[in-house]
């Protein structure tokens, strides 16, 4: 499982011109599900995202997590995070989970996250327009297999 985590002051997702998700201070997470991801990958990624200390405390030091800050979470499924562009010019997406498995895992991720923080999402497999204001900017890449 891969994620691009961005600290944002605001983020929104539109589908067919309609806002389907919107948050204020929190994290915008693009999440890619790999074909062999398990519950262990899901749990590792969720704990990492919720507890990543990338929010500033009263001294200006990045010392607070999303949970500690009480921030919101925008989750958007993005299979292209699993693209492999090392050969040729067209990325290969063979490592991405098939849509049915990816949706099942993504939905479980959303459900578990929603039990702990306010969550908004995009629409799975829809063409989305994602806009955000990256606060910092702060952007972190995560991989449950630690491949970076």
Swiss-Prot record:
Domain of life of the source: Bacteria
Catalytic activity: glycyl-tRNA(Ala) + H2O = tRNA(Ala) + glycine + H(+); a D-aminoacyl-tRNA + H2O = a tRNA + a D-alpha-amino acid + H(+)
Location(s) in or outside the cell: Cytoplasm
Motif window: Gly-cisPro motif, important for rejection of L-amino acids: 136-137
Protein keywords: Cytoplasm, Hydrolase, RNA-binding, tRNA-binding
Example of a GO MF term: D-tyrosyl-tRNA(Tyr) deacylase activity
EC number of this enzyme: 3.1.1.96
Any single Pfam family the record assigns to this protein: Tyr_Deacylase
Coiled-coil boundaries: none
Any Gene Ontology biological process: D-amino acid catabolic process
GO cellular component assignments: cytoplasm
Domain comment (free text): A Gly-cisPro motif from one monomer fits into the active site of the other monomer to allow specific chiral rejection of L-amino acids.
Family: Belongs to the DTD family.
NCBIfam families: D-aminoacyl-tRNA deacylase
PANTHER family for this protein: D-AMINOACYL-TRNA DEACYLASE 1, D-TYROSYL-TRNA TYR DEACYLASE
Biological role stated in the UniProt entry: An aminoacyl-tRNA editing enzyme that deacylates mischarged D-aminoacyl-tRNAs. Also deacylates mischarged glycyl-tRNA(Ala), protecting cells against glycine mischarging by AlaRS. Acts via tRNA-based rather than protein-based catalysis; rejects L-amino acids rather than detecting D-amino acids in the active site. By recycling D-aminoacyl-tRNA to D-amino acids and free tRNA molecules, this enzyme counteracts the toxicity associated with the formation of D-aminoacyl-tRNA entities in vivo and helps enforce protein L-homochirality.
Subunit structure of this chain's protein: Homodimer.
Protein name: D-aminoacyl-tRNA deacylase
């Amino acid at each position: 499982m891969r994620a691009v985590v961005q600290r944002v002051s605001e983020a929104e997702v539109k589908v067919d011109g309609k806002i389907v998700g919107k948050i204020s201070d929190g994290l915008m997470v693009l999440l890619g599900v790999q074909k062999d991801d398990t519950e262990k990958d899901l749990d590792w990624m969720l704990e990492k995202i919720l507890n990543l200390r990338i929010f500033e405390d009263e001294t200006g030091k990045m010392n607070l997590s999303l949970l500690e800050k009480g921030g919101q979470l925008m989750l958007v499924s993005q299979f292209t995070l699993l693209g492999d562009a090392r050969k040729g010019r067209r990325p290969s997406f063979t490592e991405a989970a098939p849509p049915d498995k990816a949706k099942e895992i993504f939905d479980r991720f959303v459900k578990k996250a929603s039990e702990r923080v306010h969550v908004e999402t995009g629409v799975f497999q829809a063409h989305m327009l994602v806009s955000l204001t990256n606060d910092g900017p702060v952007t972190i890449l995560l991989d449950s297999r630690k491949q970076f």
